[in-house]
A protein has these predicted regions:
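C-terminal lobe/tail of nucleotide-utilizing enzymes
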Residues: 1-21, 188-275
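Phosphate-binding P-loop
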Residues: 28-34
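Residue-level signature of catalytic and energy-coupling elements of molecular machines
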Residues: 33, 44, 70, 78, ...
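Walker A/P-loop phosphate-binding motif and the immediately C-terminal alpha-helix
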Residues: 35-73, 188
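Phosphate-binding loop that captures ATP/GTP phosphates
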Residues: 66, 71-116, 128
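Glycine-rich phosphate-binding loops of nucleotide-dependent enzymes
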Residues: 107, 131, 150, 163, ...
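Phosphate-binding/switch loop-helix module in NTP-utilizing enzymes
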Residues: 113-161
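Conserved Switch II/interswitch segment of TRAFAC-class P-loop GTPases
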Residues: 141-148, 154-155, 166-187
Length: 275
C-alpha cells in the first residue's frame, strides 16, 4: 500500500485521517466582501425582499459599502426595488454589478435577461449554479456587507448559499400568521444544521396604524412570533407595519428614499458580526 501524501482530494480511500472537503466557493479574485448576511423566509409573500432592500439602505446610510445578491432566480425583484436595469458590464476579470443612485451594488438574473419579463425556466441544480456564479464571477468592489436575498423555503438555493458562501449571519423575515410559526421553525433549524448563526427575526406586516387615531390594527391576527423567538432563544429585531408608502417606493425603484429607522436593532445585530 502506498504511503499517504496528505492530499485527500486525490485519494478514494475512506481512512480515519481523511479530511472533510470544504464546499465553500472561491470569491472572484478581483472582488472583496467582508461580511455576508442571508435574509431568508420560510414561505413567500412575507416581504423578505423589501426587508433585504431596507437593510441594505440602512447600512449604506451608515457609510458602509453595501451589495445585494438577488438569489431568488425565479422571482428576482432587487432591480425593481432599486430602479436598476443593467449591469456595469463585463470583461476578462468578471461581471460588474449594477450601481444604484447611492452606490449600492446589485446583482440579479433580471439584469442579464434581454426581457426582464421572461421567465427563468431552469431546474434546481442550474438555478443553484447561477447563484454560486454570482459569488465566483461577479466583481464585488470593496463590499463591507453583502446581503443575500434568498428565495423562500429550504430548497436547493438556500442549501447552496449556506454551503458555498461564507455566511456570517441570517435574518429571518416572518409575518403574523399561524402557519408561518411552523415554517419559520424550519428556517431556524436549517440554519442551525448548517452551523450559521441566526441573528434574529424581523416581523413584516405586523400591524396597520390607523391614520385617524394612531391605533395599531392587527390585520393578520395575533402574532405568534414571541413564542417561537422564546423557543429558540432568539431576539425579535423589528416589527414593521403595513406601509403603502414603502410598497409604492419599492414598485417605483425608490427604496433608497424610505425611512429605515425601525430596523436599527437589526442593523446593530449585523454590525456585531464584525466583533
Amino acid at each position: 500500500m502506498s504511503s499517504c501524501n496528505g492530499n485527500c482530494s486525490e485519494c478514494g480511500s475512506d481512512c480515519a485521517d481523511r479530511k472533510p472537503e470544504s464546499l465553500l466557493a472561491e470569491l472572484n479574485p478581483n472582488a472583496s466582501v467582508k461580511k455576508v448576511i442571508a435574509v431568508v423566509s420560510g414561505k413567500g409573500g412575507v416581504g423578505k425582499s423589501t426587508v433585504t432592500s431596507m437593510l441594505a439602505v440602512a447600512m449604506a446610510r451608515k457609510g458602509k459599502r453595501v451589495g445585494v445578491l438577488d438569489a431568488d432566480i425565479t422571482g428576482p425583484s432587487a432591480p425593481t426595488a432599486f430602479g436598476v436595469t443593467e449591469c456595469q458590464g463585463a470583461d476578462e476579470h468578471g461581471l460588474y454589478p449594477a450601481l444604484t443612485r447611492t452606490g449600492i451594488q446589485v446583482m440579479s438574473i433580471n439584469l442579464l435577461l434581454d426581457n426582464p419579463a421572461d421567465p427563468v425556466v431552469w431546474r434546481g441544480p442550474v438555478i443553484a449554479g447561477a447563484v454560486k456564479q454570482f459569488w465566483t464571477d461577479v466583481i464585488w468592489e470593496d463590499v463591507d456587507y453583502l446581503f443575500v436575498d434568498m428565495p423562500p423555503g429550504t430548497g436547493d438555493v438556500p442549501l447552496t448559499v449556506f454551503q458555498s458562501l461564507p455566511v456570517d449571519g441570517v435574518i429571518i423575515v416572518t409575518s403574523p400568521q399561524d402557519l408561518v410559526s411552523m415554517i419559520v421553525a424550519k428556517a431556524v433549524k436549517m440554519a442551525n444544521m448548517m452551523h450559521i448563526p441566526v441573528l434574529g427575526f424581523v416581523e413584516n406586516y405586523s400591524y396597520l396604524r390607523c391614520p385617524d387615531c394612531g391605533r395599531k390594527i392587527s390585520v393578520f391576527g395575533k402574532s405568534h412570533l414571541d413564542e417561537i423567538a422564546a423557543q429558540f432563544d432568539l431576539p425579535i429585531l423589528a416589527r414593521l407595519p403595513i406601509d403603502p408608502a414603502v410598497a409604492e417606493a419599492y414598485d417605483n425603484g425608490q427604496m433608497e428614499t424610505v425611512n429605515t429607522e425601525a430596523l436599527s436593532a437589526a442593523v446593530e445585530a449585523i454590525e456585531k458580526t464584525d466583533v
